[in-house]
Regions:
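A conserved amphipathic terminal alpha-helix motif
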Residues: 111-157
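Juxtamembrane/interface motifs at transmembrane-helix termini
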Residues: 42-46, 55, 126-128
């Protein structure tokens, strides 16, 4: 992880047969998160990015959390920070996509500082499982993405 935030870090890796471009679209399009994730409510983009609709500055809401894109380098790197809705003072996640032959390695890393003293170990366990689930689910979905998925819309980057 290039830029570390907080004393705790977590990470997960998954491999998919989908290309890095396909995976990147599923990461940056907020509405696509509802296609591959298991969230209590629909994900949506609240605000477009400064130079690209889903780029740096874009704000995504996956209630109760709100996140802002801080790094956008298609199709290799994507990073975001939590703005609200999580029991964390600071949270930054970075996703790196590495093409390897006919596959793409998804490396999802996060760093955080707990909001409440004594909760760091429990939050690390939770976030480690969450990122592992995210990496596996997006990898699986990208190999089987159906028409109608928001990540398949033209000109989304």
């Amino acid at each position: 992880m290039r830029q570390r935030t907080g004393p705790y870090s977590v990470g997960a890796t998954a491999t998919t047969r989908a290309g890095a471009e396909v995976v990147f679209k599923h990461l940056v399009v907020a509405e696509a998160w509802s296609e591959w994730g298991t969230f209590p409510s629909r994900a949506r983009r609240e605000r477009p990015g400064d130079d690209a609709p889903n780029g740096v500055g874009a704000i995504r809401a996956i209630p109760p959390a709100r996140e802002q894109v801080v790094e956008y380098d298609p199709p290799r790197r994507y990073a975001y920070v939590a703005l609200s809705g999580l029991p964390l003072k600071e949270y930054r996640a970075e996703v790196t996509l590495e093409p390897r032959g006919f596959e793409t390695v998804i490396r999802w890393e996060g760093a955080f500082e707990p909001k409440y003293r004594g909760t760091g170990a429990l939050l690390r366990l939770f976030l480690d499982r969450m990122l592992t689930s995210f990496a596996r689910r997006v990898a699986y979905h990208c190999e089987r993405c159906e028409p109608g998925c928001p990540a398949r819309l033209p000109d989304i980057l």
